[in-house]
């Protein structure tokens, strides 16, 4: 069978490419070996946020007296939390399938094998395509730490499905995944220790705000070991032993469970990528241009496989650009205003340049900061909670970066992203009328 577009991978990049191509009138084949929605929908973005919302609700109930609401006894049911997570995932997977079907996308379940740029095999069937879009995503990276193979560690998948709480949890890696799980388990009463090799958690996020978030979770009982290298792992009857070294010397952490959350890497093996001879980056990702085109004509790459930004919303936009290229529509990918969010409680979000990235690029910038208490809505809904909004301006007073610590940072950061993408100056942004009272008004107040 022949299609105008063959897509390998049904995650955010893959299903967005398929839907966009279908809407554009192209014949589309989407091959997915697991479940539609990819890591994001099945074992990443959505399930973690579902768990975190349960934890946040539990936290709110425990502290309801701050808002003059008395709840005598507050408890949680972990198996039901996990069951609800699974229900949410199933519902959204069905939604993705329905959208693809409505746009005449042919969906095949199985492992794809690329024969050449116009030929893909899946099972006993061979398919021909005019254009090939690779959206194979990324996989958990487990570093070769001595003893790692002898330890019964968790990955994010295990943590998502555990129906029993460990008394203690050691997390290797203080990035987004590590901190979100640290937040979840800490809220439910687990003793959490985060071991991070860098000098601050959440590498890539604003360092000042990351430190403030860490300080908040330190108050809540999480122990952080920064600038700390894990040198060995072992398993005992008491649990996992994490041996480490840092400036203070050598030490170890013993925890009932160990979560490995060091990071992810693009999936480049197992589907015949080598048969395409695509140009790759130094880190093994596939090199693409601003139209998501690879070094081989009619072959496109979107999502984590590009190595640019391992974020679902980036993948969605890349997929749109790739299909627009196939359709002959003028479009190009921009990474200037890709927002990043960590769904802890409080949330932390940022878009554009951080102070660290601006310094590295030798950009002259001005920083404006304001406590979130300048937002009336924030004060009304966050009793006894502090937060910070930070905006970076360049020499022309254009907005080049914005960062927020405080709820709901995830819902307001797009306001700043829009300003950055459009190249707005502080004066232009100041003219925008914000509804009152909203937390988003903080972006008007800060200027």
Predicted segments — roles?
Residues 1-13, 165-175:
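Beta1/beta-strand and adjacent pyrophosphate-binding region of the FAD-binding site
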Residues 1-3, 123-131, 248-257, 295:
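Core beta-strand elements of the Rossmann-like FAD/NAD(P) dinucleotide-binding domain
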Residues 2-3, 19-26, 31-165, 193, ...:
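Glycine-rich flavin
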Residues 6-34, 39, 46, 50-57, ...:
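Flexible, glycine-rich terminal cap/loop adjacent to redox cofactors
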Residues 45, 136-191, 195, 223-224, ...:
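Glycine-rich dinucleotide-binding loop and its adjacent helix/turn
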Residues 140, 284-297, 377-390, 394:
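FAD-binding beta-loop-beta segment adjacent to the flavin cofactor pocket
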Residues 149-165, 252-327:
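FAD-site-proximal beta/loop scaffold in flavoenzymes
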